[in-house]
UniProtKB/Swiss-Prot annotation:
Designated gene of the protein: HSR4
Protein name as catalogued: Protein HYPER-SENSITIVITY-RELATED 4
UniProt xrefs under InterPro entries: AAA+_ATPase, AAA_N_dom, ATPase_AAA_core, ATPase_AAA_CS, Mitochondrial_chaperone_BCS1, P-loop_NTPase
Stretch list, region Disordered: 508-532
Upper lineage: Eukaryota, Viridiplantae, Streptophyta, Embryophyta, Tracheophyta
Record's bilayer topology term: Single-pass membrane protein
Length: 576
């Protein structure tokens, strides 16, 4: 139509019915469901593929690790079997250096021994860590001697103990390894040669706390351990164990608990001598700085001499109880040579008493100045079969080796002081000589107080008179005081015993004098025969009479000098 505008043609869809809407919604739902299932299947396929990938990766890692481990084991075996020890150590050091460069930890190794001597830090750590054992530790060592009151708890090997000091964590591990000796078989172990245990502690901490560990923590631990050991210390007496002589020398000393009841309060000896000994001991243990200032080794020597039964062993036990020192009983005949003696003595601990009983009988100590030719046994080349010499013993008592230890007491005992070499007796070796005499009235009163619990009795005066007139030992008097529970009967029996003992003394004295006269007579006869033989030899030495007579005069002069020297020496011994 003219003048009319053309409008765009718009297609209008028919309005869907409700049935058509339902079908469309159903189709749409099925489509979404298919899409959801497709997505799930795709994700499931992806997860399965990822798991397989991870499993393959794990297998690859394990295979690689096994290959590396096998290669490392093979390399280690080749290094140990075919490379010299020097190269082996060099390679090990290189690997440790590489791994240590990237580590923030520092390790301190504390071995049980420093050369021949005990390592004080190791002993302190062993005592200190016993108080740091926690429930996380699975293995510990516990021991107890029959007469000890406390259990000894120590860390078992390869156990880790953690300690915290001023907020810093320190990790301790005990390492042990056994070294077998082929020189000696231990009769207590039928399956192996003698085993010697080498022990060490490993201390780990962050390397930035190095100064704290060395300058503060370790000194604190040593001081704390020393106090702990003194508080719970049980006295011990050590003796040599021959079957352990060829391992560590500390293992050669075996100990038992020392439960000796002797004290200075109960000790029956002269009261003045007892007081003097106690004061000397107390002064010795308090003078550490003094010995250091004057340049002397911190040690003290005592010589106990006197007849058997006068209380030498009881005095040693009283000294140990007074100072709380362990005792090392050294049997010199069990030691093969000077080197072995030196190592055994160095293995003894500080704050201890070393005793050599009956030193005049325990070993033939040859005088260093003697011109006596060596015996056949002295020419044996193997040093293990050469005996201890006087020189070797003296070198440890006051030589350079005497400074290898602190707060030590050395005690020699003998029944016959005059038999000892003078070199053993001088100050610096045996500083104090203590004469353990026969029983005196004061000794008897001490015994009566200990055994009978009495201070006075009407029979004391008679007993004291008998004791002054008789050579009787405190041990013999003590035996009489134990004969009866009745005080009167005991003291009356002691009076009768002293009478019998006095008669025995007189008989022994007469017998001794008779023996001395016979010995002098034999000596004179032997001297006369020697002189006659020497004169005969002198007379045939020359054809000229004047030369013979001159030689004879010189011989007689020399013999007179020898006789004078022998006489002076005999008088000196008698006077002593």
């Amino acid at each position: 139509m003219e003048g009319s505008k053309l409008l765009p043609c718009v297609h209008k869809s028919p309005v869907p019915t409700s049935h058509q809407l339902y079908i469309n919604y159903e189709i749409l739902g099925l489509t979404k469901l298919k899409k959801h299932k497709y997505t799930q299947n795709k994700m499931s396929s992806s997860d399965s593929s990822s798991a397989e990938s991870r499993l393959a990766t794990a297998k690859t890692v394990l295979t690689t690790a096994a290959s590396v481990a096998a290669t490392a084991m093979l390399a280690r075996s080749l290094v140990q079997d075919y490379l010299p020890d020097e190269v082996h150590h060099y390679i090990s050091y290189g690997f440790r250096s590489i791994f240590g460069y990237f580590s923030s930890q520092m390790t301190i190794i504390i071995e049980e021994f420093e050369g021949f001597a005990h390592n004080e830090v190791f002993e302190a750590a062993e005592a200190y860590l016993a108080t740091k054992i926690s429930p996380s530790n699975k293995r510990i060592k516990v021991s107890k001697h029959e007469k000890e009151n406390n259990y000894n708890v120590t860390v078992e090997r390869d156990e880790e103990v953690v300690d915290t000091y001023n907020g810093v964590k320190f990790q301790w591990i005990l390492h042990c390894r056994h070294v077998e000796s082929k020189h000696f078989h231990n009769p207590r172990d039928l399956n192996s040669t003698l085993r010697s245990e080498v022990r060490s502690f490993e201390l780990n901490f962050h390397k930035k706390f190095k100064d704290v560990a060395l300058e503060s923590y370790l000194p604190f631990m040593v001081k704390r351990a020393t106090l702990m050991k003194q508080e719970k210390k049980t006295l011990k007496i050590f003796t040599l164990s021959p079957e352990n002589m060829y391992g560590n020398y500390s293992d050669a000393w075996t100990s038992v608990t020392l439960d000796h009841p002797s004290t200075f309060k109960t000790l029956a000896m002269d009261s003045d001598v007892k007081t003097s000994v106690m004061e000397d001991l107390d002064k010795f243990v308090k003078r550490r700085d003094f010995y250091k200032r004057v340049g002397k080794a911190w040690k003290r020597g005592y010589l106990l001499y006197g007849p058997p039964g006068t209380g030498k062993s009881s005095l040693i036990a009283a000294m140990a109880n007074h100072l709380n020192f362990d005792i090392y009983d050294l049997e010199l005949t069990a030691v093969n040579n000077n080197s072995e003696l030196r190592r055994l003595l160095i293995a003894t601990a500080n704050r201890s008493i070393l005793i050599v009983e009956d030193i005049d009988c325990s070993l033939e100590l040859k005088d260093r100045t003697s011109d006596e030719p060596p015996r056949e046994s002295d020419d044996i080349e193997d040093p293990r079969y050469k005996k201890v010499t006087l020189s070797g013993l003296l070198n440890f008592i006051d030589g350079l080796w005497s400074s290898c230890g602190d707060e030590r007491i050395i005690i020699f005992t003998t029944n016959y002081k005059e038999k000892l070499d003078a070199a053993l007796l001088r100050p610096g070796r045996m500083d104090m000589h203590i004469h353990m005499s026969y029983c005196t009235p004061s000794t008897f009163k001490a015994l009566a107080l200990n055994y009978l619990e009495i201070k006075e009795h009407r029979l004391f005066s008679k007993i004291e008179e008998g004791i002054e007139a008789t050579e009787v030992t405190p041990a013999e008097v003590a035996e009489q005081l134990m004969r009866n529970d009745s005080v009167d009967k005991v003291l009356e029996g002691l009076i009768e015993f002293l009478k019998v003992k006095k008669i025995e003394n007189e008989q022994d004295k007469a017998k001794t004098e008779k023996q001395e006269l016979e010995n002098k007579k034999k000596t004179k006869e032997g001297t006369d025969s020697v002189v006659k033989k020497e004169v005969d030899e002198q007379l045939v030495r020359n054809d000229r009479v004047d030369k013979v007579l001159e030689g004879l005069v010189e011989l007689l002069k020399a013999k007179k000098i020898e006789d004078d020297q022998d006489k002076a020496k005999h008088e000196e011994v008698e006077q002593h």
